[in-house]
């Protein structure tokens, strides 16, 4: 699995390469590799605008790109960014301004597979800053709720795509 994240301007920096590695580790888990032996998947991501949740957008875009390319997946992925503000407030899908002022930022990647309790399973998580265990659990719950909306968006997008193809 190869992911190339191209910044909006200039050459890729160290932080861009770290983002690429995190996207690869999340997306690789979703690909059904036994059906694609000795195959390399390459996803090219071009940053158009960074509203603050670039990494989550990259994971979600990669998942949709693989789905659109008819790559067999074990599950779909939904990535959500949550920040803890200096005041202790939780925000999902923060802007870049909110992200820069946050005490901690957390990225959660969920699979469409459900756990025993019926919710999506956590594939990976990344944290920047300090967060208490209680705040981590609250952030996870908020991200879980947001991931359900992302999976619903996937369903409607795929249904629209197939209805257009069937009518053509």
Model-inferred region functions:
Residues 1-168:
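Polyanion-binding surfaces on beta-sheet-dominated domains and ring/shell assemblies
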